[in-house]
Amino acid sequence: MKVCYTGGAVKDCGSYYSVATNAVELRIWFLTDDILRIRAGFDGDWDEASYSLTMTAWESRTDELMKDCRKRVQSAAAALTDGDRQAVIQGARLKVVIEKAPFRIMVYDKDGSLLHADIPDLAYREDSNHRRIHASQIEADDCFYGFGEKSGEINKAEKYMNMAPGDAMGYNAKETDSLYKHIPFYIRLNRGTKQAVGYFYHNTAECDFNMGREKRNYWHRYSSYRTDAGDIDLFLIAGPSIREIIERYTDLTGKSVMLPKAALGYPVSYTHLTLPTN
């Protein structure tokens, strides 16, 4: 097992910031003024070979393959102040605060509103089965939207979801999980403040999300992400509106192509063509 309990030195490495902890190294990129990347390298392998990203600020083994649809940008400007108890990385619109004992990362917008906070002792860990886990602070008024193709209510607050695509023909539209297509991306919207923030976990391994279903009074209310393999590789996308998050998420992963007119309206799939008696 590996658990990030304490943090060490934070270094400016040019295009990213390196964060030392007792367990693993973390790296933080200001991809844009509104998108952060936080990656915990449990295996110590920082190889880049993504087929998902259409905007990057680093070299990848898939750059040649993706050259017609990928844009390379310069990391956004930010300034590091490192101290004994905490480090602060100040960007144009986002501020990252790294508390060192206990270790956690917090992200604020330019108005000082808290967008994200890790849960100390739970945030970056590897269990005895080598699954990697990330836990984030949530509030009672938070709603969660996204996750790809899912059954049940649109708001996934207090839900547990498995992300393991398979053939789910004949599924229960209220309860079955999981379905065909999963996307480890969601938007957290607070009903009180109306502020939203996006979470995209850049990983294709099977995983699960616990959106506040689990409650332990040792810690603040939290959600968690657990993946069977790969790094915790989080892209945190600032809003504050859902519309702005969707725009920035699709900058990161690609825009949808406009469908032809014939494809709009009510779709009839091949599954139903054999069912009508007439």
Which residue stretches match the model-derived regions?
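Conserved small/polar residues in nucleotide/adenosyl-binding loops
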Residues: T271-T277
